[in-house]
Regions:
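Sec-dependent N-terminal signal peptides
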Residues: 3-13
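Pro/Ser/Thr/Gly-rich intrinsically disordered low-complexity regions
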Residues: 16-46, 88-90, 94-96, 103, ...
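Subset of Sec-pathway N-terminal targeting signals
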Residues: 17-255, 488, 499-501, 545-567, ...
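Active-site-adjacent bridging/hinge elements
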Residues: 35, 118-120, 268, 330-334, ...
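Beta-strand-connecting loop/turn residues
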Residues: 52-54, 129, 159, 210-212, ...
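Exposed acidic/Ser/Thr-rich ligand/metal-binding surfaces
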Residues: 59, 124-131, 135-152, 161-162, ...
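Generic structural signal for alpha-helix starts
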Residues: 79, 304, 413, 652-654
Length: 736
């Protein structure tokens, strides 16, 4: 019998006659030498970060599912480069001594585990040290509680700090962790600007200018990677951080540039103008209208004293509260509340008149002007042709007015609303029937209530930045940040010039940057860039029509970076079927089409692909929301939008997901196909079948020689026993 390796609890099992480490209980048969896997039932981490020092407390509950009393080792891989200053361990509440092993000794242990367990998962950590603790006894069918506290210095580059936390993750369909939670209390000595987690979706709550909490909670948790957090401090109005990824110096690199205002105490309070344009047609009757009224009341209560505002309701015709923008005063707010209370849902939908009325005020606006546009329908009065309506609104809006759209329900024209936000550099939001309008609008309004810098423009001097997403830069608000992902050529020192307006006056900021000539760090930047690129192209297909050139580029990028969504999966399967039919690729070189689940899921994926062309309905709303998430992707979960719709039941009755067979290693995707992991870099070669292959048997002397001579192979080898990958210009194939 083969026992799998547990990343954090390794149980060395030998026969009774060897070292008497296990005493089996009759009538249990004597186990064979090997490794048991303890089930990790719960995981809790609490972290206190004080500028550049972190104290991490990890509590884990492991379950021994056997009827045997076991001896084993608890092993905890340390973050790469971590300088652990002190640590303590507790077993079931009793403090116990452990040992701290350097990377060399740890690698020897990892390799020995691979030899005995025939499971290469730990090779991913072969360059890292570890904490090890002997545990005895581990009682049968009982929970083993382990608590670990350690302190270490954070990695730092300039004024950007990074924190890493090892998480239990595997590549072979691990059992989910019943409960998982992480809470970070972050304190800094200077103004805290960027807070960024690329690996998981987290909640970030700022508590003043120098403190924040970061965390997540999950049930049935499965982690695809370790946890990483970046944060940046800066005493000035704006902060910036740059992350480069460039594994090959001969090729263009990838960059992630983040700009943030933080909650800077001395940031100037920028006055804004805002118009609330609300659909009051008959279809908005009932609960929808009441929620819309509540949302408007919330926004009115949170206007700044120096703001100007107006309310416009529209049905068969448009009616404004004021003739134009008016100051925030007690009298005007009282009129506004009465205007909201008197709203009734009746009549048609005259979008043209309402939006043109709101845009008229742009002539008098000498500061940021926002329009919040809420509707649940399509234009039925006035200009009803979407393209003509967009032309009229575009001619009226010179580009200074931001239109933020809220589509309510599923019967709206998503293409119209999305194009409206695109041409005005706004943002789109949808409220499904089961969602609350008030919550969606109020959450959004709090984010835009305090603009810091508007009408942004940027350029980089010293290196060439290209293929940057998003294509247009949004305004920057207090407590918020925005990021740009792109490619670059050249390297070394560069300068970012950022210009914008603060209270109607032009301001220019310059930031020093340094782009790496070659670096293996920050490999997540490549798939995030891939997600934004694919999202942008899918939006072009949605809004402007499909073309072979666009589809081919979506397929290429999605394959390379593992952007597996219901939309891209169908396009990949369709493309591979064509390639196989023309004998351009072998079946073992396909990524999705030859997987049974890929073929069975194809009809469902086709429905999703059809949603790209539909301009209304639930599927169209979902496509708009998911693709916008891809357009602004800044964590790995956003590279697989719509993942829940890729679920299926395998022949054994187990719940699976098509995306589970995709992992990112060294900035590109690896695909599990019929038991073998295949590197997308091989599959995307023009003639992959003609490439020279180095064949190596798993767990052989040559296998460990490859690991020692080419340490970069560890990440690929950790995927499993059967892998084919490209490294240093050569193809390596490991097989049992």
């Amino acid at each position: 019998m083969k026992y799998l390796l547990s990343l954090f609890a390794l149980l060395a099992i030998t026969s009774l006659s060897a070292q008497r480490l296990i005493i089996p209980e009759p009538p249990m048969p004597r186990p064979q030498p090997g490794l048991f896997e303890l089930e990790l039932q719960s995981y809790k981490a609490e972290v206190e970060i004080d500028q550049d020092v972190a104290v991490t407390t990890v509590e884990q509950d492991f379950y021994n599912p056997t009827s045997l009393q076991l001896q084993g080792y608890f092993m905890y891989p340390l973050p790469e480069g971590a300088n652990v200053q002190q640590f303590s361990m507790w077993i079931n509440g009793k403090e116990t001594k452990g040992e701290l092993l350097d990377a060399k000794k740890a690698r020897e242990i990892y390799e020995e585990i691979v030899r005995k367990a025939l499971d290469p998962a730990l090779l991913e950590y072969s360059k890292q040290g570890l904490l090890r603790l002997r545990i005895f006894p581990i009682q049968p069918r009982s929970v083993q509680k382990i608590k670990l506290v350690y302190q270490h210095q954070l990695s730092q580059e300039g004024n950007t700090y990074s924190y890493a936390l090892p998480l239990y993750h595997r590549h072979d369909g691990q059992k989910p962790i019943e409960r998982a939670a992480l809470a970070i209390d972050l304190k800094t000595r200077e103004s805290l600007k960027t807070i960024y987690c690329p690996t998981q979706e987290v909640e970030i709550i700022r508590k003043g200018d120098r403190r924040a909490t970061v965390g997540f909670e999950a049930e049935k948790a499965v982690f695809a990677s370790d946890f990483e957090l970046f944060f940046q401090t800066d005493p000035n109005l704006l902060g910036h951080s740059l992350l480069s990824y460039r594994p090959e110096s001969s090729e263009d690199g990838f960059f992630f540039l983040n700009l943030s205002s933080g909650l800077y105490d001395e940031a100037p309070l920028v006055a804004k103008d805002i118009a609330f344009v609300v659909d009051a047609s008959g279809s908005m009757s009932g609960e929808k209208m009441q929620q819309a009224k509540n949302a408007l009341t919330f926004c009115l209560e949170h206007l700044n004293p120096q703001d100007r505002f107006n309310l416009i309701r529209f049905s068969t015709e448009a009616n404004g509260l004021f003739d134009g923008l008016k100051a925030v005063s007690k009298e005007n707010l009282a009129k506004a509340r009465g205007f909201v209370d008197d709203m009734e849902a009746i009549g048609g939908t005259n979008m043209e008149e309402a939006l043109l009325m709101a845009l008229e005020s742009a002539q008098e606006a000498d500061r940021p002007y926002f329009i919040i546009f809420l509707t649940d329908g399509k234009p039925t009065i006035g200009e009803t042709q979407p393209e003509q309506l967009l032309k009229k609104l575009g001619a009226k809006n010179t580009g200074r007015v931001r239109i933020f759209t809220f589509g309510v329900g599923t019967e709206i024209n998503t293409h119209l609303l999305d194009k409206l936000t695109e041409q005005s550099r706004g943002y789109r939001t949808y409220v499904l029937p089961e969602e609350d309008i008030e919550i969606k609008v109020s959450d959004f309004y709090l984010k835009v209530a305090h603009p810091v810098l508007t009408d942004l423009r940027w350029e980089v001097e010293g290196v060439k930045a290209k293929e940057v997403y998003p294509k247009t830069i949004p305004d920057l608000f207090k407590g918020s940040n925005f990021s740009m992902l792109g490619r670059y050529s050249g390297s070394g020192k560069a300068t970012l010039k950022l210009t914008g307006k603060v209270n109607g006056k032009d301001r220019e900021f310059t930031f020093p940057l340094e782009f790496a000539k070659q670096t293996d760090e920050n490999e997540f930047v490549a798939p995030l860039w891939g997600s934004r690129s694919v999202g942008y192209l899918l939006d072009q297909i949605r809004l402007n029509g499909e073309s072979k050139e666009l589809v081919d580029e979506v397929v290429r990028l999605a394959k390379k970076y593992g952007i597996i969504t219901p939309y891209t999966s169908y396009l990949i399967i369709e493309d591979e079927a064509e390639q196989l039919g023309m004998n351009r690729i072998r079946r073992d070189e396909s990524l999705l089409s030859q997987r049974v689940e890929g073929r069975t899921q194809a009809p469902k994926m086709k429905e999703a692909e059809d949603d790209l062309a539909n301009d209304s309905g639930r599927g169209s709303v979902r496509a708009s929301e998911e693709i916008q998430e891809m357009n602004y992707a800044d964590n790995m979960a956003q590279t697989q939008m719509g993942r829940s719709r890729l679920e299926y039941t395998d022949p054994a009755g187990r719940q699976r997901n098509l995306a589970d067979g995709v992992m990112n290693v060294q900035g590109r995707a690896q695909y599990l196909n019929n038991g073998q992991w295949l590197d997308s870099a091989i599959a995307l070669q023009e003639n992959p079948g003609r490439m020279t292959v180095n064949h190596i048997q798993f767990n052989s002397p040559e296998y460990f020689q490859l690991l020692r001579e080419r340490p970069a192979s560890a990440e690929f080898l950790a995927l499993g026993r059967n892998v084919r990958f490209l490294l240093d210009g050569q193809v390596w194939e490991v097989a049992e």
